[in-house]
């Protein structure tokens, strides 16, 4: 389904891909600019307590909290489950089936991570470890992918198995991505059964293929449930 959804089976008439100018911060800022009420950013959430009248969202070290009618957990499935102080059996049973894998992302300018023939360079470039075929990495050519107006080539390599010149590394980030196995795919269809239970709703890329667009799509569907 993933390959079909992205048109990867097609040799001709493949879909045209587009990149949002200035990346994801553009649509995040666009959404924030349209919020008429107050919003708070960069709060570390300790726990979420729920009752019949609403929800308390605890943050910080002083056990402070915000009180709301409902809460939307638009985070990874495992993170959402960890925040809930009293998860239901269904929430635990369903959300525990979504696993995540740590990935290392390296931003650099080392052209040795790309194909030797520059004519073969593209936005996404995959490499397979010759000593371990189960070990692979992907290098994104950011100049091409994000239309960077600079002369130097900048790359983003995910889980490099090869050495990248340390003098050409600008940043290294560790983050997590959904890991889709049979259990995860089976439980995607069950996620709607835990929506709007105990004043709690869920959204995230794990509802789909793990992309930003999947997160947005799940949010739209979640809002339909919220307004029912």
How would you describe each model-predicted region?
Residues 39-41, 73, 202:
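A structural signal for the hydrophobic beta-strands that form the central parallel beta-sheet
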Residues 42-44, 60, 203:
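Conserved beta-strand termini and adjacent loop/short-helix elements that scaffold enzyme active sites
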Residues 1-48:
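Active-site/ligand-binding neighborhood in enzyme catalytic cores
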Residues 34, 86, 225:
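Active-site catalytic microenvironments for nucleophilic, acid-base chemistry
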Residues 17-24, 64, 73, 208-215:
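Aromatic-acidic/polar surface patches that form glycan- and anion
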């Amino acid at each position: 389904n993933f390959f079909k959804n992205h048109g990867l089976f097609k040799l001709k008439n493949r879909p045209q891909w587009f990149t949002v100018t200035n990346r994801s911060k553009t649509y995040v800022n666009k959404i924030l600019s349209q919020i008429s009420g107050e919003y708070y950013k960069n709060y570390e959430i300790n726990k979420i307590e729920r009752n019949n009248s609403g929800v308390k969202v605890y943050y910080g070290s002083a056990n402070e909290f915000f009180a709301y009618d409902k809460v939307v957990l638009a985070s990874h499935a495992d993170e959402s489950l960890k925040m809930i102080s009293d998860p239901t059996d269904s929430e635990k049973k369903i959300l525990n089936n979504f696993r995540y894998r740590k990935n290392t992302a390296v931003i650099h300018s080392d052209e040795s991570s790309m194909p030797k023939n520059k004519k073969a360079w593209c936005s996404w470039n995959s490499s397979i470890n010759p000593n371990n075929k189960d070990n692979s990495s992907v290098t994104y050519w950011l100049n091409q992918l994000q239309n960077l107006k600079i002369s130097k080539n900048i790359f983003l390599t995910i889980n490099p198995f090869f050495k990248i010149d340390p003098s050409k590394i600008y940043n290294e980030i560790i983050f997590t991505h959904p890991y889709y196995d049979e259990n995860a795919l089976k439980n995607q269809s069950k996620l709607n059964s835990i929506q709007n239970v105990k004043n709690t709703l869920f959204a995230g890329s794990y509802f789909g293929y793990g992309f930003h667009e999947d997160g947005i799509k799940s949010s739209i569907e979640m809002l339909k449930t919220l307004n029912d």
